[in-house]
C-alpha cells in the first residue's frame, strides 16, 4: 500500500478504464477522488470513455457536487452499469438522448457478482431476473438504442433456465473508509453503512486492477481492534487522505452523526411524524398486513416513510425493518437519508445482505409501484419522463414470501379524510392501473407459480393478486365503487364476493390501532 497525494491519481487511472464504486448517494462516496478526476479532465479532456459500475446512484441531490452527473455532463462516461438512478437528472437525460450506453440490472446481482469475479466463474448465473425486463427475451436490461452489447444471456442447466450475467472486469475500484493504518487496513468506523467495498476490492485485485481508498486519516498500527478491519491492506494499492471535510461527509446533510454509524442510540425519531393525508393513510393500511416477529424489507418511494408510522404507533419492537443496503432493525431514515438506520441492531456488508434476502430471510417486502396491469404485473423503472431503474426491486420481489405494493391510485388526486371516511375532492389522472405496463419489473405469473402472497394498497382500495389477475377486496368508506375506483382503472378487476370496507379508524389524526393488528393471527 502506498499513501499518495490526490494529484498522483491521474497517472494511475487511464482513459477507457472500467471504474467501480461502492457508494450510496454520498455515503461511502470518495468525493475528493472524483473531484480530482473531474478537474483533471477539465484541463485537457483526456479522461473519457470510462465504464462506470455502481449498485446505487451517487449524488447529493444538490447538483453542485462531484458525482455521477459531473462525469456525465463532461462526456467522461461511455457506458453505465447500475440498478437505479434517483437524483442524477443529467445522467437520465444522457440515457434518454442516447448519449451514453446504459444498463439497469438488479442491484443484488450487481453487488454479489463481485464474488463471481474472485472465483473465476463464467459470469453470475442466477434465476433472479427471469421473465422480467432484464431477461434477454425482453430488453436484457438495456436502457436505450445506443446500448447493443448483451450482458445478460439465457442458459439451461439440468433442464432449468437461468440468466447468465457477464460483467466487465474492473480496472479501478474507488472506495472510501474512515481510517487506514500503516499496513493499509481499512476501517469503516464513522461510515453509515459498510457497502460492498470488500468484495469489490477482491474482484479488482483478482483482475490485477488498482484499489484506491479515500480516508479521513492514516493512523499507526494497533490503534483499532483487528476485528474491525473491513478491507485487509493486502487488497489496497493506494490510500489518499481527505483534505476537505465537505468531500467526505458521512451522509448527504450530515458531516458525521455517531448515531448513524451505530455508536449510540437515539430516544425518538429525529424526523417529524407524517401529517394525516394520502401517504399516511396508505402506509397505515399497508402496515396492517404485518405480523409480530416479521422481518421486513422497506423499499424506496412511499414506503421509505413506513418506519415513521411504525415509530408513531410504538410498534418498532414487534417487527424488524431492514434496508437492502445492509442495515438491520431500528428506525429507518427517509427521503434523502433513506438507506441509513438509527438504533440499528446489526450492520452487514451489502453483498451479504443479498445472501440473507436470497435465502428466505424476509417475511414481508414493502415495495412501490408506478404501473400495474390487470394480471398484476408491475412497472417501477420506466414511466412517463422517469426512467429510474429497478434497484433491488426485482431481487426482493422474486424471493420474498409476502409483498405489499403501496402507492396512490391516481396521480394528482385530492382527497379529504374526515369523520372516519374518505371524500374525493378531485379525481386526478388515471395513469397507474393500465392495460399494459411499460416495463416488466414484477411478473405476476412468476409470483403465482411460487405461491407468493401479493397485495396492492392504495388510498381508495386494496387488491389481492390471484391466478386470474387482480382482485378488488376492500374499498375505503365514503367512496363509490364505480365512480371513485373502477373509473380510474383501464381495466375491470375481479370483484370479491365479499368486498370489505377499510377500517375507519385509520383516517383519524391519532390512530393507535397498529399494535393490535400486528398481534393478530393473520394478515388483514
Regions found by a protein language model. Give the residues of each.
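Anionic-ligand anchoring segments at beta-strand to alpha-helix junctions in alpha/beta enzyme folds, i.e.
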Residues: 127-128, 297, 305-344
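Glycine-rich beta-strand-to-loop/alpha-helix junction loops that act as flexible
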Residues: 20-25, 29, 54-56, 299-302, ...
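Active-site pocket-lining segments that scaffold enzyme catalytic pockets across diverse folds
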Residues: 282-308
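Long, compositionally biased
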Residues: 512-524
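Conserved phosphate- and dinucleotide-binding cores of soluble alpha/beta proteins
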Residues: 2-11, 25-43, 53-70, 76-267, ...
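Short helix-capping segments at alpha-helix termini
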Residues: 41-46, 313-315
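Glycine-rich phosphate-binding "P-loop"
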Residues: 263-278
Amino acid at each position: 500500500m502506498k499513501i499518495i497525494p490526490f494529484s498522483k491519481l491521474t497517472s494511475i487511472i487511464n482513459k477507457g478504464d472500467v471504474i467501480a464504486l461502492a457508494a450510496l448517494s454520498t455515503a461511502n462516496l470518495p468525493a475528493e477522488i472524483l473531484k480530482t478526476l473531474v478537474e483533471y479532465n477539465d484541463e485537457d479532456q483526456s479522461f473519457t470513455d470510462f465504464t462506470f459500475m455502481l449498485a446505487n446512484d451517487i449524488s447529493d441531490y444538490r447538483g453542485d457536487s462531484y458525482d455521477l452527473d459531473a462525469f456525465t455532463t463532461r462526456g467522461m462516461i461511455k457506458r453505465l452499469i447500475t440498478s437505479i438512478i434517483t437524483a442524477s437528472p443529467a445522467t437520465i437525460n444522457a440515457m434518454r438522448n442516447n448519449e451514453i450506453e446504459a444498463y439497469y440490472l438488479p442491484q443484488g446481482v450487481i453487488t454479489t457478482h463481485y464474488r463471481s469475479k474472485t472465483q473465476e466463474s463464467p459470469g453470475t448465473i442466477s434465476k433472479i431476473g427471469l421473465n422480467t425486463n432484464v431477461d434477454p427475451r425482453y430488453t436484457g436490461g438495456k436502457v436505450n438504442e445506443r446500448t447493443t452489447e448483451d450482458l445478460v444471456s439465457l442458459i439451461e442447466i439440468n433442464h432449468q433456465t437461468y440468466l447468465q450475467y457477464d460483467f466487465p472486469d474492473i480496472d479501478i475500484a474507488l472506495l472510501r473508509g474512515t481510517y487506514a493504518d500503516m499496513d493499509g487496513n481499512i476501517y469503516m468506523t464513522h461510515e453509515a453503512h459498510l457497502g460492498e467495498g470488500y468484495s469489490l476490492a477482491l474482484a479488482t485485485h483478482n483482475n490485477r486492477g488498482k484499489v484506491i481508498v479515500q480516508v479521513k486519516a492514516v493512523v499507526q498500527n494497533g490503534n483499532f481492534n483487528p476485528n474491525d478491519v473491513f478491507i485487509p491492506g493486502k487488497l489496497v494499492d493506494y490510500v489518499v487522505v481527505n483534505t476537505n471535510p465537505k468531500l467526505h461527509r458521512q451522509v448527504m446533510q450530515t458531516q458525521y452523526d455517531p448515531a448513524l454509524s451505530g455508536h449510540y442510540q437515539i430516544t425518538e425519531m429525529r424526523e417529524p411524524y407524517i401529517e394525516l393525508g394520502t401517504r399516511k393513510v396508505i402506509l397505515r393500511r399497508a402496515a396492517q398486513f404485518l405480523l409480530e416477529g416479521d422481518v421486513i424489507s422497506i423499499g424506496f418511494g412511499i414506503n421509505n416513510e413506513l418506519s415513521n408510522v411504525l415509530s408513531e404507533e410504538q410498534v418498532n419492537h414487534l417487527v424488524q425493518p431492514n434496508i437492502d443496503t445492509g442495515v438491520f432493525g431500528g428506525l429507518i431514515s427517509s427521503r434523502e437519508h433513506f438507506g441509513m438506520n438509527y438504533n440499528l441492531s446489526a450492520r452487514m456488508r451489502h453483498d451479504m445482505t443479498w445472501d440473507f434476502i436470497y435465502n428466505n430471510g424476509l417475511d414481508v417486502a414493502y415495495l412501490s409501484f408506478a404501473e400495474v396491469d390487470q394480471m398484476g404485473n408491475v412497472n417501477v423503472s420506466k414511466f412517463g419522463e422517469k426512467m429510474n431503474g429497478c434497484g433491488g426491486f426485482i431481487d426482493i420481489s422474486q424471493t420474498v414470501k409476502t409483498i405489499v405494493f403501496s402507492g396512490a391510485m391516481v396521480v394528482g388526486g385530492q382527497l379529504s379524510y374526515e369523520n372516519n371516511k374518505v371524500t374525493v375532492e378531485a379525481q386526478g389522472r388515471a395513469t397507474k392501473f393500465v392495460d399494459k405496463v411499460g416495463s416488466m419489473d414484477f411478473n405476476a405469473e412468476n409470483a403465482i407459480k411460487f405461491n407468493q402472497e401479493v397485495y396492492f394498497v392504495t388510498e381508495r382500495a386494496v387488491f389481492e393478486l390471484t391466478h386470474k389477475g387482480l382482485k378488488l377486496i376492500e374499498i375505503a368508506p365514503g367512496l363509490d365503487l364505480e365512480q371513485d375506483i373502477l373509473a380510474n382503472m383501464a381495466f375491470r378487476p375481479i370483484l370479491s364476493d365479499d368486498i370489505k370496507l377499510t377500517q375507519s379508524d385509520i383516517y383519524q389524526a391519532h390512530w393507535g390501532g397498529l399494535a393490535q393488528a400486528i398481534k393478530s393471527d393473520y394478515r388483514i
